[in-house]
């Protein structure tokens, strides 16, 4: 029996090869795999000796040979194939263990284009696909985690079962598809082409979820193959607590996205059902958290918390005072972990030091939404710099009002449309979102904020279609307003702001969120 081993991921390689030899397999290999096996004293033959054809073009052509692919693809149940293989001296290959050149890792390292191109595997995918196609006669192993199961079946049954071969086949085609998708994505990025004519996405399963958004829905969590430099939920380390749910992950991502709007100072964000119910910044993290929680303590119960500085004991103690679903932060002090360990179901996620950096920013990537029969892609929304804002009222905002408008505008982008946000310079005061008309969003925010809205800034994610929403905001006590503008009634809105003595700024950019 012949087995061909050629792997870039050498985890478990030597024990697997030793097990195959014990079972009577003769091994073929190339390059670094060959050297690793020889170095471990495993008997192995060079592929070029088997094919009687040298490796050429600096190793670009090693396994692309009839004695390899004929041995893999031969349909042994067909007499014609067997006779043809015999005539050409082709021996069947019954097991192929291959994983591909480290293309993704090379891209992630920042390597130059020529080096990346050399890591586009040709022979490997050809062998994997050929082996998977002929799964009735060939076991194809692309994942070292499958080595023990394959060896166990060979030892117990003298063969790999059809069920296992079918499972390995599916895994193999998924492996090559993801590999090609990564190459395609890199080439599109190199060309500055965000929306290619053909789109392939490559993700790997992080975990099966207990269920989806609701218990009757199935769910799973997938992530990119390589961890980005920016902080993410997908690559955060879970330190304690219950298994993450589908809704936890969505809310954690929403919390992290909003938190990254405030990298310069300690900040706290509380999210409930993908909606901000508390946001604050302060010189001390514990004060930021307490201020954020005080915005809406009822909604904060059972919420998701995101923090952008290491969690200290004081902040941990403050969080332990109420029921929370999950917390994501750059890190936790030993004392904080000791405090939070008493909350055994509380999920603690560590996003890493990048989240604590004053230069932390959201990752520049596309947002995807599935629709029936297709998918929508768009650039991730961003907040334009205040330099592009235009004062249109008679009265210019004071420095304090300008700071409050900046804060409100950053938060407003993260509230479902129609979105209205009242804020001071360092905290959310109230928000109203998800309504089908803007004046109702204003009124909901007013009901939540009450007297705290006096002297506040109000932000609207899109223009006010009528002055009624602005009139209500003024009645609530807002002294300044930031909005995109662009309504046919802009002049009427500006006049209303002047009538109320409000400062009005137009950003020229809308931030709908659906």
Swiss-Prot record:
Database matches in HAMAP family: PurH
Domain MGS-like as annotated: residue spans: 1-142
Gene Ontology terms for molecular function: IMP cyclohydrolase activity; phosphoribosylaminoimidazolecarboxamide formyltransferase activity
Taxonomic lineage from the root: Bacteria, Pseudomonadati, Myxococcota, Myxococcia, Myxococcales
Protein name per its UniProtKB record: Bifunctional purine biosynthesis protein PurH
Species whose genome carries this gene: Myxococcus xanthus (strain DK1622)
Domain notes: The IMP cyclohydrolase activity resides in the N-terminal region.
UniProt keyword terms in alphabetical order: Hydrolase, Multifunctional enzyme, Purine biosynthesis, Transferase
Domain of life the protein comes from: Bacteria
InterPro entries in UniProt: AICAR_Tfase_dup_dom_sf (IPR024051), Cytidine_deaminase-like (IPR016193), MGS-like_dom (IPR011607), MGS-like_dom_sf (IPR036914), PurH-like (IPR002695)
Pathway membership: Purine metabolism; IMP biosynthesis via de novo pathway; 5-formamido-1-(5-phospho-D-ribosyl)imidazole-4-carboxamide from 5-amino-1-(5-phospho-D-ribosyl)imidazole-4-carboxamide (10-formyl THF route): step 1/1; Purine metabolism; IMP biosynthesis via de novo pathway; IMP from 5-formamido-1-(5-phospho-D-ribosyl)imidazole-4-carboxamide: step 1/1
């Amino acid at each position: 029996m012949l087995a061909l081993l050629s792997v870039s991921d050498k985890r478990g390689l030597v024990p697997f090869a030793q097990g195959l030899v014990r079972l009577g397999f003769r091994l073929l290999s190339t390059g670094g795999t060959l050297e690793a096996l020889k170095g471990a004293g495993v008997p192995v033959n060079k592929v070029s000796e088997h094919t009687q054809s040298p490796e050429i073009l600096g190793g670009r052509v090693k396994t692309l040979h009839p004695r390899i692919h004929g041995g893999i693809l031969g349909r042994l149940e067909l007499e014609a194939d067997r006779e043809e293989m015999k005539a050409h001296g082709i021996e069947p290959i019954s097991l192929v263990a291959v994983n591909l050149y480290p293309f993704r890792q090379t891209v992630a390292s920042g390597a130059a284009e020529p080096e990346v191109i050399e890591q586009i595997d040709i022979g490997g995918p050809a062998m994997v696909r050929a082996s998977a196609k002929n799964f009735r006669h060939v076991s194809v192993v692309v994942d070292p985690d499958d080595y023990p199961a394959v060896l166990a079946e060979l030892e117990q049954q003298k063969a790999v079962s059809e069920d296992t071969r079918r499972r390995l086949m599916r895994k193999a085609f998924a492996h090559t598809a993801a590999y090609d998708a990564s190459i395609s994505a890199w080439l599109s990025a190199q060309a500055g082409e965000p929306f290619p004519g053909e789109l392939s996405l490559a993700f790997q399963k992080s975990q099966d979820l207990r269920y989806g958004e609701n218990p009757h829905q199935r769910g799973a969590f997938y992530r990119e193959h390589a961890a980005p430099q920016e902080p993410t939920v997908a690559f955060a380390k879970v330190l304690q607590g219950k298994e993450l749910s589908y809704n936890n992950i969505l809310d954690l991502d929403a919390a992290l996205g909003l938190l990254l709007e405030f990298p310069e100072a300690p900040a706290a964000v509380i999210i409930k059902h993908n909606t901000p119910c508390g946001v604050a910044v302060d010189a001390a993290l514990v004060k930021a958290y307490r201020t954020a929680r005080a915005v809406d303590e009822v909604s904060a119960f059972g919420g998701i918390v995101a923090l952008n500085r290491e969690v200290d004991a004081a902040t941990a103690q403050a969080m332990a005072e109420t029921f929370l679903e999950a917390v994501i932060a750059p890190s936790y002090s030993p004392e904080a972990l000791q405090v939070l360990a008493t909350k055994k179901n509380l999920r603690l996620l560590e996003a890493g030091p990048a989240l604590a950096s004053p230069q932390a920013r959201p990752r520049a990537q596309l947002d995807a939404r599935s629709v029936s029969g297709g998918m929508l892609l768009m650039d991730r929304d961003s907040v334009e710099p205040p330099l592009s804002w235009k004062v249109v009222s008679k009265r210019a905002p004071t420095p304090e009002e300008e700071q409050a408008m900046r804060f409100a505008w950053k938060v407003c982008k993260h509230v479902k449309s129609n979105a209205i946000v009242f804020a001071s310079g360092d905290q959310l005061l109230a928000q109203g979102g998800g309504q089908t008309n803007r004046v109702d969003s204003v009124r909901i925010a007013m009901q939540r904020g009450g007297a705290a809205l006096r002297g506040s800034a109000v932000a609207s994610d899109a223009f006010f279609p009528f002055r009624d929403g602005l009139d209500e905001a003024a009645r609530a006590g807002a002294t300044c307003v930031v909005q995109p503008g662009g309504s046919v009634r802009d002049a009427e809105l500006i006049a209303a702001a002047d009538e109320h003595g409000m400062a009005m700024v137009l950003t020229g950019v809308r931030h709908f969120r659906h």
